[in-house]
């Protein structure tokens, strides 16, 4: 498994980031990728751009709503990463990140960086590159406000903010056997 990815990694002289395409990376996949020597990941969870749906549309294939929603949500993929990845792994969060609040939550869950695609592409297509640049600037300013309210100077410090977890995410944590209280107090790094 992951033979082609290993070949690519071994053939290039730059770091390789393993990126999911809208379905998230679960703990089991993180473990397999770690065994192959990968240390950088973009979880690209369900909730953002769904590449299987894009490919199906391109091929003229109809997807059921259930299949189109398939995947591990970004939040859950980040929680799996916390429990699986070593401290020195690079973890990027994308998939459904649309606001500064989404970005702050991703940083709080251990992401080293976040990726935002759909809102930017829509702005570029509908209003031009300047509108997209304004969006990024406003997002950065709003993220700074979240950090100020939480007493953080950097996005990485958001990992130290205690979490409150409810609903399906709390159920996910329990189903994985993760220790909720510990997870809410400490995240990667």
What are these regions (language model features)?
Residues 27-80, 84:
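Catalytic core of soluble alpha/beta enzymes
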Residues 17-25, 90-101:
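Glycine-rich beta-to-alpha transition loops that act as phosphate-gripper elements at the mouths
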């Amino acid at each position: 498994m992951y033979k082609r990815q290993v070949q690519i990694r071994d053939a290039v002289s730059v770091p390789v980031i393993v990126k999911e395409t809208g379905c998230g990376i679960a703990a089991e996949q993180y473990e397999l990728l770690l065994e192959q020597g990968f240390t950088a990941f973009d979880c690209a969870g369900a909730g953002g751009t769904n590449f299987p749906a894009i490919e199906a549309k391109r091929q003229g294939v109809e997807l059921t709503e259930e299949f189109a929603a398939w995947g591990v949500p970004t939040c859950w993929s980040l929680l799996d990463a916390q429990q699986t990845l070593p401290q020195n792994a690079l973890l990027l969060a994308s998939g459904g990140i649309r606001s500064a609040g989404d970005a702050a939550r991703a940083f709080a869950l251990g992401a080293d960086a976040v990726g935002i695609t759909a809102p930017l592409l829509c702005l570029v297509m509908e209003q031009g590159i300047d509108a997209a640049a304004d969006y990024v600037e406003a997002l950065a300013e709003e993220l700074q406000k979240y950090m100020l309210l939480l007493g953080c100077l950097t996005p990485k410090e958001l990992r130290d903010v205690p979490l409150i977890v409810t609903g399906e995410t709390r159920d996910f944590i329990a189903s994985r056997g993760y220790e909720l209280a510990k997870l809410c107090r400490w995240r990667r790094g």
